């Protein structure tokens, strides 16, 4: 099912995001959070207005790493969800299947996948630059 594909992708990609998020949150200066508290901000507001914005570059980087890892995943997807065309088949699985029958089709799918990945990474880079200018 589609849910099995999502779970398989999350299982494989989550450690990449968690590691980056943890590093981002650990890099936030606790003195800034303490100052926010002394000025009367509640913990949730401190988290939302101080901690998350300062950790955002790491959170975004972790999301990109997790996405990139999930994009190329096929082992866990085959094990958990199978390889049913039109239902649970991801692009890497389609490439794998096409390699057995038609190498040109596999190359075409791989080029499309690489184009999608490149477009997303370029868009992320543009957003990251815009975000760094806003800070």
Question: In which residue ranges do the predicted regions lie?
Answer:
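C-terminal transmembrane helix and the adjacent membrane-cytosol boundary/short C-terminal tail
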Residues: 15, 19-37, 41, 107-135
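Loop-to-helix entry region at the N-terminal start of transmembrane alpha-helices
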Residues: 1-16
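Short, contiguous hydrophobic alpha-helices characteristic of membrane insertion segments
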Residues: 3-6, 63-68, 78, 120-125
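Interhelical loop and adjacent transmembrane-helix boundary motif
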Residues: 78-118, 123
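Transmembrane alpha-helices
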Residues: 11, 18-21, 25, 29, ...
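Juxtamembrane helix-start elements in MFS-like secondary transporters
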Residues: 1, 46-47, 106
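Hydrophobic core positions of alpha-helical segments in small-molecule transporters
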Residues: 7, 47-52, 80, 109-112
